Amino acid sequence: MIGPAGSSRRLLSCKEDEKMKIVILERNSVGTDVSVDCIKDFGEVTIYRNTVTIEEVKERVKDADIVIANKSPLNEETLKDAPNVKLICEFATGFDNCDLEYCKSRGIKVTNVVDYCTAMVAQHTFALALALSEKLPHYDDYVKSGEYSAQDRFSNFDIPFLELEGKTWGIVGMGNIGRRVAKIAEAFGCKVIFYSVTGKSTCKDYPQVDFDTLLTESDFLSLHCPLSDLTRNLIDAKALKKMKKTAVLINVARGKVVDNTALYEALVNEEIGAAGLDVVENEPLEPTNPLSRLKDRNRLIITPHLAWASVEARTRCVSGAYENIAAFLRGENRNVVNP
């Protein structure tokens, strides 16, 4: 089992009866191949493989001082009977499972782990983009079907594909991941533009454009923004109709940033070229989601929310959570998202 790298593993000097009661609600969210034993440095740890229902959350947090979670809802309903909770530590960067205002009213600090998966999410962004732009599913199938062995020439390129060089790469969300993607896109020879949903971006390295310009000019459009009232269904039917018919959409942000029904219709009607998704509206993918009916892997590739989940990234995530707890117990604020 892989242990967390980079954490200081410093034991705090506290009496045994002062140690925290810590609950890990979704141990499986970081994978069973990555150790969470370091958390035991801080007290009595109760570990659950997964926590699904509201009742499970309520029962499991009721005596906890520290709650470590990923997707479990942590709000008034689930926390009102948990008087001792002082810290919620996300095994994630996202924290939309937490009611930050309620937690603040209770004096509960919420922390997240930042920048642990930047490299991996950027890498996966291009894995999707390259697979779709080069029609790799088609050509892999062509070889494995025996057609390549049966043909009378050395090469086959029956479905045209294009280079990244010289294309325009549009980005929504110029944070750590967006900036990393921008640098890689530049290395491929792309022109990078971006749109700031809030209008408050301080990035001066790339041209900031309005939303319509982003949609109409981008050959590749990748999403790296959090889910908020401003970004929910940001990519809807109206937005998709403004994109190039050859454009490739990549969503490694949050599923509900894209209207999945509108995307399905845009792909079926060939309003855009292709889409690569690591997230969908409701996860796991529901059979009723129309995207589940689209089987053409040259037009649509969906991966099961794994862009963040390399072994290295998951190990850094545990280490980051460890450091957040250690800082909290020293009376310091580290990665607190509801100050």
Model regions and ranges:
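Phosphate-binding beta-alpha-beta segment of Rossmann-like dinucleotide-binding domains, i.e.
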Residues: V114-T168, R180
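Rossmann-like dinucleotide-binding domain for NAD(H)/NADP(H)
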Residues: T246, V252-P339
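N-terminal glycine-/charge-rich "phosphate-binding" loop or analogous flexible N-terminal tail
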Residues: I2-S7, L11-I66, I193
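Rossmann-like adenosine-cofactor binding region
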Residues: N75-L79, I193, V197-P290
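Glycine-rich Rossmann-fold phosphate-binding loop(s) that bind the pyrophosphate
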Residues: M174-G175
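Short beta->alpha connector loops at strand-helix junctions that form conserved
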Residues: R49, F91-A92, I108-A119, S196, ...
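Short, well-ordered coil/turn residues at beta-beta hairpins
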Residues: L25, N70, F91, H224-P226, ...
